[in-house]
Amino acid sequence: MVCCLLREGVHMKRTGLLLTGMLIVTGCLTYAWRTLPRQESDLYLQENVGAKQEESESAEQVVQREQEDGYAYGRLSEEKQELYLEIRDALVQFDEDVKLSSCDKEEISHVFQCVLNDHPEIFYVEGYTYTEYTLGDILKKITFTGSYRFDQEEIAEKQKLIDDYVNQCLSGMPENADDYTKVKYIYEYLIHHTEYDAEVEDNQNICSVFIEGRSVCQGYAKATQYLLNKAGVFATLVLGRVVGGEGHAWNLVQIDGQYYYVDTTWGDASYQAVGGTGYPGEKIPTINYDYLCVPTAQMNLTHTLDNVVELPECNSMEANYYVREGFYFTEWNEEQVERIFREEYEKGSAYVTLKCVSDGVYRQMQEALIDRQEVFRYLDCPEGVVSYSDNEEQYSMSFWL
């Protein structure tokens, strides 16, 4: 890299590397399956740890840029928003040695993460380098250069494949779908078309999902965000940890003005199998809906947030999958159970999943359906054996039909 000095004198250079892969994420899902220095002159210090913004913008342009950027951008101070735009523009236009408005390395790292959280389409960035320019022991400026996983020709080729996937996916979305239907459709589509694979290349970005059809949680979450944004639904990336302390990624979405969490990875049966959840053979629900549009309280049972920026408290259950689909029990109700089983048989479903509002209702359901074996009243199983799974943390249980 070219060394630049403000004045003649001795210079020193130190190199290192910061990659974006700070989230090598797996996660753990609990589910049970059962049968019944200083220099005399200028010093430039370089470490490895995006188009230049116009000198001025009109108020309308500022608003437009803010609308085009995401959730994290909107929750930064004005100073950090300026830094955010400098970093974002440098990354998307492949600019080098861009002078930043901040000389705080921790702030630069934080805002860099905000940019990546808001922009899953910047899939080709794997880190950045910064250069410190000092006069004596006084830091004068920092410049920024992105580090890229692919060259621009490769990026264009991959983007074509990504566009093909997105067009195929969205072409099958129901016409006039409301936001809940869009979220549910994309959740299901990604699960049906993706296998959990910690060994696949590019598993921290959307290429693994859209090109390889295999990924880990950050790939799932960024793909979910990308598709929902393309479909006109707000979605952003959320980082945190799950049971066991492993890094994890999922999404925050907005439906009818209310925020919900979505974890597409934990909804995928292939993750449940790889995660060692105890399912034998093929006895795994194809899709686990426990993590489709859930409130903060429910998510906190298994997930812990790393607040890159402040996140809202999700309190609504209106767009929760089980509520919208009629599988949610606020009290033990035999008629509701009978209706659900009957309708799912009529639809040819492979299994039924029931979810309860509380541990108390869950225990009532468990006592009736399992302990007293009343589930056989609703099942067509002449052999007298039923396979089921339960998730005590989420107060849900599934029965195979």
Predicted regions and their residues:
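Short helix/strand-bridging catalytic loops that position acidic/His residues to coordinate divalent metals
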Residues: 207-213, 238-241
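N-terminal accessory/pre-domain segments preceding catalytic cores
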Residues: 4, 13-177, 294-401
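N-terminal secretory signal peptides that target proteins for export/translocation
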Residues: 1-9
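Hydrophobic/aromatic-rich core segments of domains that either
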Residues: 219-294
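Secondary-structure boundary elements
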Residues: 151-209
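Short, well-ordered strand-loop elements centered on a beta-strand within folded domains, enriched
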Residues: 140, 144, 208, 212, ...
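Secondary-structure capping and boundary motifs in well-ordered enzyme cores
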Residues: 212-216, 220
